[in-house]
Structure formats: structure tokens, C-alpha cells
């Protein structure tokens, strides 16, 4: 149990498959119960999600950050298997994390949200589209991939889906808009609660300072967080 900058961080390490996947919990100051965000990492691994935690804590949200790679030995090299070979297993593991959060005495079980970045954007969409969380936001999320694409995450959506906000850039070199846009349109056709915003002149990983390919963009990083917080507030049970 570690206290850091006024926030309580609990590190939970799963050693057997009967336990939930590796995850960390972060709580804002106060007694709660708090709304919670399930924050989901990129294909560069679990460490990439940690930079997003501070903004949600400052807004009064607890944060759960599951590592959906470690148990399956997934790396950047075999990342496509996240959505094919291991898809159904990861679905179950993330549902279990949501259930764990809802059973946490510090959490308000009526207000659970998801946010994901790149690979994690796929899973944030899954959790909301399949009604496991109140709403989800996908930041430069995965909507398509070469050779083995199976129609997901667009296939998760239906007329009964909970709200999802997809944020994407029109200068993407990883999840190029020409491949993503048809999938976004499919999701929008299936669910009237699906919304999306395309940022002009913006590429992939806009919140990642070390990422050189598409470039860090502090303005879009801030705007994306603000839009996400507003979206969650709109879907909060009072």
C-alpha cells in the first residue's frame, strides 16, 4: 500500500489464473464512494496508461488500470492477437475487473466508466457497447487492423448499447482514418448513442511525449480529457 501525492495506490499482483488480472487502483482524496474509470493501455504495454491517471483523480474519479497483456504474454509484436486469439478471454477478464470495482466499498457502483488509448480504446468501446459500464471513450482507438480483422469492435454495438465517444485524428498513421471511418460509421448505424469527433491535423498517440511518429499535442490531450470528463458527467447517475 503506497501513499503518493495525496492519493492512495494499491498494487495488486495476480499470481494464479483464478484471480483477476494484474491491476492497480487509484483513489482521489476523500472518503467516497467515488465514480470510477477503468483506464485501458495501448499496445506499447501497461506502463502507457499511468500518465492518464492524474487527470481523472483530479476530477474526483477513482481509477482502475488493468493489464490485459501480461497473463497472455502479449507484446507489441503480437498485439493483433489481443482482438483475435485472446479476445474472448480478455472480455471475461475485463468484465471481472468491472465487477471488482463495483464491489469496492470506496466505489459508487452506479457510476462506472471506461477510457482506452489505441488498443485500450477497442476495449473501452467493448465495455460500454456491451453495457458493462455507463459510458466509454476511445482515444485514437483501434477500429481495424490488417489481415485478421473480424469486424470488432463495431460488432459489439447495438440499439441497446450504452454511450461511446470515439476521438480520432485525421492524420493518423497507425489507425488511418480511411480504414477507421467505415467502422465508426457501422457503430453509429447500430447505436444512436455512439458519438465521434475527428481532430484536424492530429495523429496517433497525441498524449505521448516520447512518441515521435505522429507527434505529441498538448492542446488535443487537454481537449480530449475535457471532452471525456464532460461525456462521463452527462452519463452519471445522480
What do the PLM-derived regions correspond to, one by one?
Residues 33-42:
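Short beta-strand element of the alpha/beta-hydrolase
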Residues 83-104:
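Alpha/beta-hydrolase active-site loop
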Residues 106-117:
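Alpha/beta-hydrolase fold nucleophile elbow
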Residues 116-120, 124:
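Gly/Ala-rich beta-loop-alpha elbow adjacent to hydrolase catalytic centers
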Residues 193-238:
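C-terminal catalytic histidine-bearing segment of alpha/beta-hydrolase fold enzymes
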